[in-house]
Amino acid sequence: MCVYCAAGPTHPELLELAGRVGAAIADRGWTLVSGGGNVSAMGAVAHGARSRGGYTVGVIPKALVHRELADVDADELVVTDTMRERKQVMEDRADAFIALPGGIGTLEEFFEAWTAGYLGMHRKPVVMLDPFGHYDGLLDWLRGLIDTGYVAQAAMDRLTVVTEVDAALTACAAGMAGQDMTGETMAGETMAG
């Protein structure tokens, strides 16, 4: 389960959400794949998973090892040469994606996973967990682009937006079981468990 999230803000509600997501992933016996930082929501999601005995994989570019304080407690810490390589490793290691409230880094990772899913490059669930309305303006703007042809309705349909942790994980469950969003087996795609 790949979780995209912030590496800067320390808002208590964000850290609590990230910790609950990590714990819920571990409670289901799933592996957490995250950005490999030990700060903000990125650190909280990993700590949450480990607090329940979960297995964590952190993926961080060399350039961010000190800036984001690499999560040296991760069960696996993968250090990549570039941000692009980081995203590829995270996508390859994951069976589903959840984006928590975050900034441009979170959005960049999320948009790449969402776009790849929409274009048929993978059939993994892509979920936005937004209990605070953080992304409301962005989602309204994207929906507004449907009428002008800049965003296809099928692209919006490929994204699941929820406000509850359990709903996010339920939306990801098919991918974590090796199935796509329709229940079909994802042949040829790696199941990270």
Specify the residue positions occupied by each region the protein language model found.
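Short glycine-rich anion-binding loops that position phosphate/pyrophosphate groups of nucleotides
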Residues: A6-P9, N38, K62-L64, G102-T106
